[in-house]
């Protein structure tokens, strides 16, 4: 009885690398579409805070979901605030108010001070 033909090992589930497929008729290779994530930014911040610490891909996925969730909440709240005040533009003021409304106590204070610092750094660099 003939043995079944062994195929190449399948790439890991959730792998972020671009996988090249078989060439098409015009000779170009197809690539897997890129997934946008906050992984590199989470990693950079983690290394600033804890240089000797690593992070698993599962934990990175959780952190990515967390950042996306917080982003959507802040953007949604800022959008509502702009709408209530009959404004068509979300400014840093709406973002700051949204952060104050969404985050509890001391966390909101730290977030606002870090945000203000980032905006100041950005405007002075221009």
Curated annotation (Swiss-Prot):
Q: Which GO terms describe its molecular function?
A: DNA binding; protein heterodimerization activity; structural constituent of chromatin
Enumerate the SMART domains for this protein: H2B (SM00427)
One cellular component GO annotation, for this chain's record?
nucleus
Looking at the UniProt entry, the stretches that span the membrane are: none
Q: Where in the cell is it found?
A: Nucleus; Chromosome
Glycosylation sites (chain numbering): 113
Which residues constitute the cross-link Glycyl lysine isopeptide (Lys-Gly) (interchain with G-Cter in ubiquitin)? 121
UniProt keywords (A-Z) are: Acetylation, Chromosome, DNA-binding, Glycoprotein, Isopeptide bond, Nucleosome core, Nucleus, Phosphoprotein, Ubl conjugation
Q: PTM comment for this protein?
A: Monoubiquitination of Lys-121 by BRE1 gives a specific tag for epigenetic transcriptional activation and is also prerequisite for histone H3 'Lys-4' and 'Lys-79' methylation. Phosphorylated on Ser-15 during developmentally programmed apoptosis; which may facilitate apoptotic chromatin condensation.
Which residues are recorded with the post-translational modification N6-acetyllysine?
Answer: 6, 13, 16, 21
Region of interest (Disordered), residue spans = 1-35
Write out the similarity annotation. Answer: Belongs to the histone H2B family.
According to the record's subunit comment, the protein's assembly and interactions are: The nucleosome is a histone octamer containing two molecules each of H2A, H2B, H3 and H4 assembled in one H3-H4 heterotetramer and two H2A-H2B heterodimers. The octamer wraps approximately 147 bp of DNA.
What protein name does the entry list? Histone H2B 1.2
What is the scientific name of the source organism?
Xenopus laevis (African clawed frog)
């Amino acid at each position: 009885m003939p043995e079944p033909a062994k195929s190449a090992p399948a790439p890991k589930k959730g792998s972020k690398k671009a996988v090249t497929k078989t060439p098409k008729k015009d000779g170009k290779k197809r690539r897997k579409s890129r997934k946008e994530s906050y992984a590199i930014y989470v990693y950079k911040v983690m290394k600033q805070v804890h240089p000797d610490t690593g992070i698993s891909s599962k934990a990175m996925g959780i952190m990515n979901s967390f950042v996306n969730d917080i982003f959507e909440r802040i953007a949604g709240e800022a959008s509502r605030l702009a709408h209530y005040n009959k404004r068509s533009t979300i400014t840093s003021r709406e973002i700051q108010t949204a952060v104050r409304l969404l985050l509890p106590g001391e966390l909101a204070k730290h977030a606002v001070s870090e945000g203000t610092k980032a905006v100041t750094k950005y405007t002075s660099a221009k």
